[in-house]
Amino acid sequence: MSLQQTIEQAFENRNEYSPATMPQDVRDAINQVLEQLDNGTLRVAEKKDGEWVVNQWAKKAVLLSFRLNDNYVQAAGEHVQFYDKVPTKFANWTEAQFKEAGVRVVPPAVARKGSYIAPGAVLMPSYVNIGAYVDQGAMVDTWATVGSCAQIGKNVHLSGGVGIGGVLEPLQANPTIIEDNCFIGARSEIVEGVIVEEGAVISMGVYIGQSTRIYDRETGEIHRGRVPAGSVVVPGSLPSEDGTHSLYAAIIVKKVDAQTRAKTSVNELLRLA
């Protein structure tokens, strides 16, 4: 039976499993998937022929992993302890391992085992959950959170306090995806499997879930679940049909190409909106 088949079958029987009753072959399969997610050789979602494909079986392995262990005390220095069932990624790393990985981890940043942090990525005091993928050159700024199985592209900047939603709680079908070269402004939230396409700029305080209307003021189009590539997005509202009230919406105020994006600072793009 293949690794995928073992996980798929185990997921169907997941309610029968606990740390005490987990079969050894299932335990080994889950740990193998977690190790592959941790070193980046497996991803919960990947782009193939221009479309994002979700490896649902890998996500199922992440969900099953919470049945592997009971909570246990995890020491983090002389005065700090955690009590959880998932180990942290860097708990036993040596200086040589950090240098080889090429990542910078600023205290008290935490990444869970089973997340991948690519070379050149920087974790300011932040949190990266299990199954997440943080690609090369990404900056996860102070108090930003990268949810379980979320996919963060190359050179993405997640500003202070940004929340990128996960798949575990509440259970989601697909991970949230931030493609390459995107900027997510401070305190913004992107959740529920929304895809922010390449080069988009999200202003401070923008909240986008699957039901959020994303209004393009140049074309009048309304998008849901997807921010088109190169969009510059700010918070706003749209009026009701009867004109009695307005409801929150994300507003695409302009589109920029890669050349413009390279020559123009994020602040300038937003000021000129």
UniProtKB/Swiss-Prot annotation:
Uppermost EC category: transferase
Compartments, record wording: Cytoplasm
CDD domains linked to this entry: LbH_THP_succinylT
Keyword annotations from UniProtKB, A to Z: Acyltransferase, Amino-acid biosynthesis, Cytoplasm, Diaminopimelate biosynthesis, Lysine biosynthesis, Repeat, Transferase
GO cellular component terms attached to this protein's record: cytoplasm
Molecular function GO terms recorded: 2,3,4,5-tetrahydropyridine-2,6-dicarboxylate N-succinyltransferase activity; nucleotidyltransferase activity
Gene3D superfamilies cross-referenced by the UniProt entry: Hexapeptide repeat proteins, Tetrahydrodipicolinate-N-succinyltransferase, N-terminal domain
InterPro entries: DapD_Trfase_Hexpep_rpt_fam, Hexapep, Hexapep_transf_CS, THP_succinylTrfase_dom1, THP_succinylTrfase_N_sf, Trimer_LpxA-like_sf
E.C. designation(s): 2.3.1.117
Chain positions recorded as substrate binding sites: 104, 141
Domain of life of the native organism: Bacteria
Protein family according to the UniProt entry: Belongs to the transferase hexapeptide repeat family.
Name of the protein in its database record: 2,3,4,5-tetrahydropyridine-2,6-dicarboxylate N-succinyltransferase
Taxonomic source organism: Psychrobacter cryohalolentis (strain ATCC BAA-1226 / DSM 17306 / VKM B-2378 / K5)
Lineage: Bacteria, Pseudomonadati, Pseudomonadota, Gammaproteobacteria, Moraxellales
